[in-house]
Amino acid sequence: MESETETAVRRETGTVDWTTAILAGLGAGVVMGLLIQFVMGIMPVIGALYGAEGLVTGWVAHLVHSVAFALVFAAIVSRPPLAKYADSPGTAAGLGLGYGVLLWAVAAAVVMPTWMGAVGLPSPGVPNLDPQSLVGHVVFGVLLGGLYAVLSR
């Protein structure tokens, strides 16, 4: 009962559960990171964006990005009219799916290749509409939304 009251108050006031967002971002980020490392094979490139190409640097940078994007997601879905959908794992996963597609279209398709070129790395060009990247971002978004709802309870 206390959890239901807390959730209702959070929904009405637009309060963000930052800890839940961080945990959901880390969980979704680890799964996406495994796809980046083992399917796409580009985890070291993420570290190279910060001048230190390597697997560990790539993972650290990726998880920091995951948490940052999770905090933005939580801030967005904690506000009306989306807040009423963020409490159910199914609908929150749907919100996450849309968020994942948006991240792919902006961060992966435009920002990352631009950043790569700016730091002297070979760039796939803008926009980079890589379907593997789309799958990774959709997986991230769906897990982020679902985990955010489940962990908020």
Feature map (PLM): residue ranges:
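Mid-bilayer segments of alpha-helical transmembrane spans in multi-pass integral membrane proteins
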Residues: 100-110, 134, 138
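Membrane-interface interhelical connector segments
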Residues: 40-53
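Cytoplasmic juxtamembrane regions at transmembrane-helix boundaries
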Residues: 80-102
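Interfacial helix-loop-helix junctions of multi-pass membrane proteins
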Residues: 109-133
